[in-house]
Each structure stands twice: as C-alpha cells, then as structure tokens.
Swiss-Prot record:
Homodimer. Residues 311-329 have a biased composition (Low complexity). This is Methionine--tRNA ligase. ATP binds at T381. PROSITE patterns: AA_TRNA_LIGASE_I, TRBD. The gene is metG.
Length: 741
C-alpha cells in the first residue's frame, strides 16, 4: 500500500451491518452469467466467468438452495452487425451460428445451464417491450435531441461501434460507446471527439437527432442505498461508488439501427443492446420455469418485487429513507450476477436502476471476475494468441482440470495468468498428488483388504474434520468465494493423506480394530471429498461416486451426504487423474509461440466487450477495467542510491489473514519470509477477499519501524498500487524471503 493508505488505515475505522439471511434461504435464487456476444469463437479466457457461475450454482444447490442457473447469447448490438456485414450475411444468421456453437461448447466443459436462450427469441423481445413500457408509464423515459455521428458518404447514422474517435475524458482512442483503450468509461452518443466512420473511413459529422433517455439520475438516492446492500466481490461493491456518488448522467437507450428490439411505437429506432441484453436473465428464467413448471420453479416469485411499478416521484432521488429500506426494496428472490469486471458499471448502476423502476427484484450480489493473461500477456484473438476452447479439448485434456485451475488459481476478482507449465504443476501436484492420490489409495486398499467399507462407526475426530470442511464450503458460498468452495475439498484431501500416512494401515493385520477404523474413516473422507468437490470437478466426483458403489445422482445430493455412511462393498477403483508429462508442456508452449502473428500496432491484446463476454476479438485482457483513478504527479525530489538501499524489500507469501474487529478497512496479515513469519496490518479488507489471499506472493517493506494499529502490532508494510490496492507480486515464483534489488 502507499504511505498515504498506510497512514489512513491507522486513522479510519468503519463498521458494516449484515442485512441479508445467509444461504440457503427460503427464497428462490437465480444465478446468471454475463451474456457472451454471439460474435466469435470461445477461448479459455472467456470460460472463467462461466465456470465460476456453474460452480457457484452447483454449490448453492448442494446447500439445498432452490436455484436456477441461466444465461444466453447476446444477439444484438453493433459488433454483430459490423461483422455480419463483413461476411455478407444477415446479423441474425451470423449470431445464430455462434449461439449454436456456445450451446455445444458450454456443456463440454461441464457448464450446465438450467436454461440458455438468446436475446432475439420471442420471449426476450416481449419481456423487453414489457419492461420498457413499464419504464415509460412510470415516467422514467423522456425524449431529448442530441448530436449523433453520421456518415454522409454512406448516408448512414453511426451508432456505437460504427464510429471511432477520441475519448473526451482521457484523450485515448475510443469506440463510439466505450473508451476501450483508455479510461474504460461508457460513452453516450455524441460524446466521442474527432469521429471517424468505420464504414468508409471518412470523417463523420454530427447531426441533431431525437433519442429516448432513461432518467438514471432520478434514481441516484436509490442506487446509493442499493450499493450499501449489495453483496459479492469487493470490486463490484466499491467500483460503482465513484459513478453513483458523482454526477450521474441519464442514459440514452435507443440507437439508429435496424438490428435489435424495436423501440415501442418507433420502428426507426431500436433499443440499445444494454437494455435488452440483461433482460435476457429474466427471459431465460421464465423459459426454464415454463419448461419445468411453476411448481418446480416460479420465475415471478424470483424476479418480481412488488405489484405494479414505482412512479417517477416515489422512486426518484427524493425517495424517503423508508422507501429505500431493505424490507420493502427486495421482496423477490436471490439474484446473483456473475460477470467479468469490465461490465461492473452496467450491472451495478444501469441494470438495478431499470429493475427498481420497473418493479423487479434488485440483485443481491454481483461477483466480478478478474482478467486472464496468457503467459504474462493478454489474449489476442486477432494474433491467434489464445488457447481456444475446442483446442483444449482436442489436446486431450479433461474439462475438470481447467475448471479446477480457473476456480482456485487466485481469488475470483483477481487477475490470473494461464501457462501450460503452471497448469501442469497445479494438476500434477494438487489434483493428482493430493486429491487423486488419497482417493485412489484409500479405495484400492479398502477394496482389496475389506471388499469395501469396514463395518465400524466413523471416528469422532474425522467426523468433526468433515463438519469443518462443510462449514468452510458453506462459508465460501456466503462469502462469494469460488476458490474457498474448491479449497474445502482439497484441504480435506490433504488431511486424508496425512491421516492415512500417519496410521499406516498397511502395516496392520485385517483383524486389528485400528486398521478397520482407519479405513472406515478414509472411505468416509473420500466420499465427503466427492460431495464437496462436485461443483468444481463434476465428472471426477461422478466417477468417485460410482467407484464407491453409491446409488443415485451425486449432482443432486445435499451436502449432508458427506456424512452418510458409504456402501459396504465396492470394487477396485480406477485412477482419478493422470499426470501431465513435461514434454507435453514444451510441445504446447512451442505450438502457441509458433502460431502467434506479429502485432499490427503497439497493443498486446484486443479488447472488445459489451454485454458480457465479447468473443469476436477477446475479453479478460490485462488492461484495467476502468482506469478512472487520477495519477499522482511524479515527485521532483530525488533520493540517492544509498537511500534506496536502506529499504529492505522482500518477497513474502501470505499464510494467514483475518479482519480486525471494529476496523472495516483493516486486516491482520501473516506472511512467510522464508526465515521467519511476520505480522502486518494492511488497509485492504474492503478491497480484497481475505480468504483468497492465502498463498499469494506479495512484496513487503521488511525494515519499516513497527507500529501499533487498532491494538495490533504491524511489523512491515505490504506494497500495493493505486486506490484499489492492487498487490505487488513477482512474475515468476520467487521464494519467500528473496530480496528485491
């Protein structure tokens, strides 16, 4: 952290109030994933959000929470229209082709949506018109004349991606609706400077045109209170405050196009893609309910807030505190949005404003994933710098391996890097060496020695250990930590390996009660691991379930099954995971390097995201999601080299974290420095999920004077960048204690 942050952390303390019931609740839950643009092929960087959503949905169901997991393809918007025109096909046929591809690809990776629709289907078109009509009737939509980019040579209006230019806020090159190369801000029509048509390459001109606006500014008070209630990852909770607490601008919700959902009573305008795209969450839930029956899942109970809609006056910035209280804000279900962090603004400002004004349930939580890099650099589909989803499968790797890597390789909101060498290391050491090794050796030994599970009671100590793992799993769900959900099973497997190794049952005779007890405990541990690991590695869990001779479907059992006695007889198992040879890594790394084309400009990665995951070029690159932070000027005063040498900067590994009582921003961090452990106090609690930091490599100032902060001794300083406290780390795996020079 900076010295300013360090000083402020010593001065500030705030408290939080938990307002929502923990999962599982009696209300229906809807878990959604950001809609992928039906615009190109999927690579593994795109899959992080969808794997995370699938894991979280499965985990909720495991706890007994009534849950619908839904998403769909985004068929509309200018990127689809632009690319369809380049291919000489209609936008609908272009988008449908990619939609059908996604319908095939997601299940191949164990991503099992309860419903996967698309924004151009009849259900979503009707639902969109219904909600927009509700906004109009409530007085939240008005007409305004604005400047709109126009190409005289093409005789065409230029909405969104049909125009490029300069961002008025930071001066970077930008698209018509987004500063994608600079500050990341959403741009309204008419804002972009020096506009250029992407159709002809000519300079565009601005002409006045009437468009429809949604009065987001009238909901500023509501949005501020909504953010106070919002759960999820800390980036989704904190990033929107700068927008909501600033000068909130109304939102242009129409475009001059013929591809999209028509604006009511005006066939010359279509709705902006960010209006109809999130409504697909509701439409997809409705389709699911219609398929299974409302007795199984009632979509209205999940999505509808209160009868009717709020009028402009009752839901405006003049809302009373009573109108914004949690008791009458949210009368529907538990809505959890799982997205990429580049679309936080849409899901925490525009979308909840629409829902609230139209009388629908506000989101309970938004979980925003970090980006994924590929061997330290951004994915670039235009340069073929990517590991494609179909390529991963064609190389013979099981989807569960990638699911585990994406779920547990860092916290969900943190950026993570994919490399074939790191992938091999995680698979061989953790899946093969820890989880697979324990389950295989336990089941094999029990099958050979006892034909299955010894007929003795589970020991109290192992039962308590499984209960602890169940508690950790449940806590992970309620803390919105995908990593913690996966770690619960892995830590139980680590315990199992230590347990069987300590007791060495192979040295005992079959009539020794101790041998029977140890193997009874180990088989129960194996079953518990399968139950807890199913959300992360569903296919592997299914195999363990079958190897145990269990009946029924492991994908539908409750978490309490982890403590139900396993069958007494089963056959010898097969090995769960296979090691990846080092030569495979060399082969795959070389294959990637050989095919990557030279960059055409200074950018290492393409960026093209609109309603979720834009797969035409790429998403999840390493650029900042907003870059709206003001950069401090570089200090004029210099220090000499001797002064710099006085700083003892060390690589450290975080081994323990906990919040400091009565200090909302402070956390106690214990780090391993190789030769000793140190305790630090850091003001990062509101910016990071503390559990996700365990095992992270960081940089600290090791020779800073000790300080007492909120009664806790701090022996060093954790270094981080910017207001979001982006923790400094090393590119390679430097050992704890390594000096930084």
């Amino acid at each position: 952290m900076t010295m300013k942050q360090y000083t402020m952390s010593k001065m500030n303390a705030e408290t939080q109030t938990q307002t929502r019931e923990s999962f599982p609740t009696d209300d229906p839950a809807v878990v959604t994933c950001g809609l992928p643009y039906a615009n190109g092929d999927l690579h593994i960087g795109h899959l992080r959000t969808y794997v995370g959503g699938d894991i979280f949905s499965r985990a909720l169901k495991r706890l007994g929470q009534e849950t619908a997991f839904v998403s769909g393809s985004d068929m509309h918007g200018t990127p689809v229209a632009v690319n369809a025109a380049e291919e000489g096909v209609t936008p609908e046929s272009f988008a449908l082709r990619h939609h059908e591809q996604y319908e095939t690809t997601f299940p191949q990776f164990g991503i099992e949506f309860d419903n996967y629709g698309h924004t151009h289907d009849e259900t979503n078109v009707e639902m969109t018109r219904e909600i927009v009509e509700a906004l109009i009737q409530a007085g939240y939509v008005y007409e305004r004349e604005i400047p709109v980019a126009y190409d005289p040579a093409a005789d065409q209006w230029l909405p969104d991606r049909f125009v490029n230019g300069t961002c008025p806020y930071c001066g970077a090159h930008a698209r018509g609706d987004e500063c994608d190369e600079g500050c990341g801000r959403h741009l309204e029509p008419g804002e972009i400077e020096t506009p250029v048509s992407t159709i002809t390459g000519n300079d565009a001109e601005y002409r006045r045109r009437e468009h429809q606006f949604f009065a987001v500014s009238e909901l500023q008070s509501y949005l501020s209170s909504f953010l106070d209630r919002l759960e999820g990852t800390t980036n989704a909770q904190n990033q929107p405050r700068e927008w909501v607490e600033g000068e909130l601008q109304d939102w242009c919700i129409t475009r001059d196009m013929d591809w999209g959902v028509d604006y009511p009573d005006d066939n010359d305008l279509v709705l902006y893609v960010w209006v109809d795209a999130p409504i697909e969450y509701i439409s997809s839930t409705k389709q699911y309910a219609e398929r299974v029956g409302t007795d199984s899942f009632d979509w209205k109970n999940a999505w509808r807030d209160i009868p009717g809609v709020r009028s402009h006056s009752s839901s405006s910035a003049k809302d009373s505190s009573e109108g914004n209280s949690p008791s009458n804000i949210n009368n529907g279900g538990e809505i959890i949005h799982i997205i990429g962090r580049d679309i936080i603004q849409h899901h925490t400002v525009f979308w909840p404003a629409m829902l609230h004004a139209a009388g629908y349930t506000e989101p309970r939580a938004v979980m925003a994933s970090g980006f994924i890099t590929l061997e330290g650099k951004g994915f670039s589909t235009s340069r073929n710098r990517a590991v494609w989803a179909d390529e991963y499968l064609a190389e013979g790797f099981h989807p569960d391996l990638l699911r585990y890597y994406l779920a547990t390789n860092g916290g969900f909101q943190q950026d993570v890097d994919f490399s074939w060498s790191r992938f091999r290391e995680r698979v061989n050491n953790e899946l093969v060496g820890t989880v697979g090794n324990f389950i295989y050796r336990s089941l094999l030994f029990a099958a050979r020695e006892f034909d299955g599970t010894p007929d003795v009671a589970l020991s109290d100590s192992v039962e308590e250990r499984i209960e602890t793992a169940i508690d950790a799993f449940t806590a992970g769900v309620n803390e919105y930590s995908v990593r913690a959900v996966g770690d619960a099973a892995v830590k139980l497997a680590q315990f199992g390996n230590e347990y069987i190794q300590h007791h060495e049952p192979w040295k005992l005779s079959n009539d020794d009660p101790q041998k029977q007890q140890v193997m009874r405990d180990c088989i129960q541990l194996a079953k518990a691991i399968a139950v807890l690991f199913e959300p992360v590695t569903p296919a592997a869990a299914e195999r363990v379930w079958a190897d145990l001779g269990e009946s029924g479907d492991i994908h539908t059992v409750g978490i309490e099954s982890a403590l139900v006695a396993p069958p007494q007889t089963f056959d010898e198992p097969t090995e769960l995971f296979e090691k990846i040879p080092e030569e495979r890594v060399d082969e795959l790394t070389a294959k990637l390097a050989d095919r990557v084309t030279d960059p055409t400009d200074d950018d290492d990665s393409d960026t093209d995201t609109e309603t979720g995951t834009d797969v035409a070029e790429t998403t999840n690159e390493s650029h900042s999601e907003s870059n709206m932070t003001e950069i401090d000027p570089i200090a004029d005063e210099r220090i000499d080299f001797e002064e710099f040498e006085e700083l003892d900067l060390r690589v450290a590994e975080i081994i323990e974290t906990e919040p400091i009582e009565d200090a909302d921003k402070l956390a106690r961090i214990v780090v391993d420095l190789g030769i000793e452990q140190r305790q630090l106090v850091a003001g990062i609690r509101q910016l990071h999920d503390l559990d996700d930091l365990i095992g992270e490599t960081v940089v600290i100032v090791a020779n800073l004077e000790k300080a007492e902060i909120f009664g806790v001794e701090s022996n060093g300083m954790l270094l981080a960048a910017g207001a979001d406290a982006d923790l400094l780390t090393t590119r390679e795996d430097a050992d704890p204690g390594t000096s930084i020079q």
